[in-house]
């Protein structure tokens, strides 16, 4: 499978730059303020990322902590920002002692590849094709294998307090808790959905959701995907056969193993809200934590290309 014609129009991207907003723009930032000066350019080896230097300081007036879960419905422009923001929520909860947790829902507007913290780039990703097509490859802070992200794939992340849910310190219980919660929320519209493998949700034996986690001292980040209407051809185009496979996969190809929920986005979105009891919107978020993570980790070649 070669060439560009298999993909939706407009997916190809050769060079990418982005700049963060000034601190005075948009909603309040969560936990810090930012002072900007000259812009700097960082070369990840794949694409150029333009970032402003900043100095961060605590601003207690915008901290929000409670025992109620908060909803963050936010998609950023750059793939690095979106992957970093999940970790920023985890760090903010850990720093500020939040016990209610967060639910974040977002959807990519362009194609990129995400690899797990312990993934081997060469073994899991066709780097030549990604480079030719201008598709970024980003390493996340949680485990699991490589995935392709794009329009039609709804991402979610939950940050949960381990003080409120001490049993989630055990990884198997964390998987069971979050996946059973997700499945319960989706079952009214997808009766056949079930947990498969360690961290998948499947319908009639085909994967519709992959998930991974990361633990800190007092909080858990659990995040994953829900495919509802994503073209599946890019999976085989950009990914190699994974070195680790769940038993239920039975050596099937990406195309035969993965499927979509075939539901409208709004239906899947509402099912996610229902699963987590319709949390209230967060009025401020840890934007400068995210910016710092992008600058120091997610936009760097040393992080993405590290050898596990």
Regions flagged by a language model, labelled:
Residues 1-13, 20:
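Extreme N-terminal basic, low-complexity initiation segments
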Residues 127, 151, 155-278, 301-308:
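Catalytic beta-strand/loop module used to bind and position nucleotide/cofactor moieties
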């Amino acid at each position: 499978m070669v060439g560009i014609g298999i993909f939706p129009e407009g997916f190809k991207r050769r060079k990418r730059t982005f700049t963060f907003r000034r601190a005075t723009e948009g909603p309040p930032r969560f936990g810090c303020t930012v002072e900007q000066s000259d812009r700097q350019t960082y070369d990840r080896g794949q694409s150029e990322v333009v970032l402003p230097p900043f100095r961060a300081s605590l601003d207690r007036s915008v901290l929000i902590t409670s025992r109620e879960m908060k909803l963050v419905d936010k998609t950023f422009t750059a793939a690095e920002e979106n992957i970093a923001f999940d970790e920023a929520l985890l760090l903010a909860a850990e720093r500020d002692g939040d016990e209610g947790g967060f639910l974040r829902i977002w959807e990519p507007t362009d194609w990129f590849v995400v690899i797990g913290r312990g993934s081997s780039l060469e073994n899991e990703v066709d780097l030549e094709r990604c480079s030719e097509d201008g598709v970024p490859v980003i390493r996340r802070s949680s485990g699991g294998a490589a995935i392709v992200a794009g329009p039609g794939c709804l991402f979610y992340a939950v940050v949960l307090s381990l003080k409120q849910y001490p049993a989630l310190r055990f990884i198997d219980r964390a998987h069971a808790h979050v996946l059973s919660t997700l499945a319960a929320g989706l079952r009214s519209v997808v009766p056949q959905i079930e947990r498969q493998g360690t961290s998948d949700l499947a319908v009639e034996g085909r994967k519709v959701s992959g998930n991974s986690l990361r633990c800190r001292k007092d909080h858990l980040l659990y995040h994953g995907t829900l495919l509802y209407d994503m073209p599946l051809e890019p999976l085989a185009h950009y990914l190699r056969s994974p070195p680790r496979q769940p038993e239920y996969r039975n050596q099937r190809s990406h195309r035969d193993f993965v499927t979509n929920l075939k539901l409208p986005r709004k239906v899947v979105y509402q099912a996610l809200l229902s699963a987590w009891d319709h949390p209230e919107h967060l009025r401020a978020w840890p934007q400068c934590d995210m910016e710092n993570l992008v600058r120091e980790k997610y936009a760097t070649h040393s992080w993405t290309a590290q050898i596990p």
